[in-house]
Amino acid sequence: MKSLYALIFLLFVIVVSYIFNGLWSVFNIKHVFWVNLFLLIAFHPQHLDGLIILLLIPLKIFSNFKLKLQCIIALVGILLTIIKGVIKSGFGWILRILFFFVRMMTVSFINLVVFSILLTSVYVLGYVAFLKPDDIQFGTLYTAFGGLALLGAGIKIIQHFIKQSEEIAQEEFKKWYETEVKNFMYSLFITAKNAFPKFLDDLLAKGVVSQEEYQNLIKLYSHILARILKNDEEKMKIPTF
């Protein structure tokens, strides 16, 4: 069913690209395939199929102006995809992507190669779009678009890595919180707990506060301490004394 939907969407994009690019090169089917590639990346990255996209890449490069424009469209498509993800999932989406990048760079050499291809794809697109496309060999450009196609073909694998990275990150954060953070809070709490009564004793001895004020401060301190300990027991599981 998903394959049928993807095929229908592909045909729809072809029709749309004919309409919006008809005045430019309506009879140039290869150019239409270029537009299809960028439209798919921009609006439906989850329906990309790496093999199909690679077959749609033209066998020759057209004019520099068209090439620049097409690369700009691709970059805009990538940006739209990121913006759409942020709007849909909030800024937590950015953290998931960062976790994914870290995971990609640390899991294995294969993942590092894939990650490098994706980065190279964006770099080559930007170079061709804003600098001199004549300096780029066709094989390099093909590799760049192949990286984007790989991104589309491996979207499920990427989602798996993102989920796995989230789980690993959560586990690492939990471990760090359980050891470093809680121990620091515990030691800080002990220091404050022992220091504050001595501080009040000094104030009383120097006559800064009266006996009545001292008693009121001790009561207030004891009340706050009890509330803190209760919250710690419920939320952070810090042991009582």
UniProtKB/Swiss-Prot annotation:
It is a multi-pass membrane protein. The chain crosses the membrane at residues 7-27, 37-57, 72-92, 110-130, 138-158. This is Uncharacterized protein MJ0998. GO terms for cellular component: plasma membrane. It is found in: Cell membrane. Its main location: membrane. Keywords: Cell membrane, Membrane, Transmembrane, Transmembrane helix.
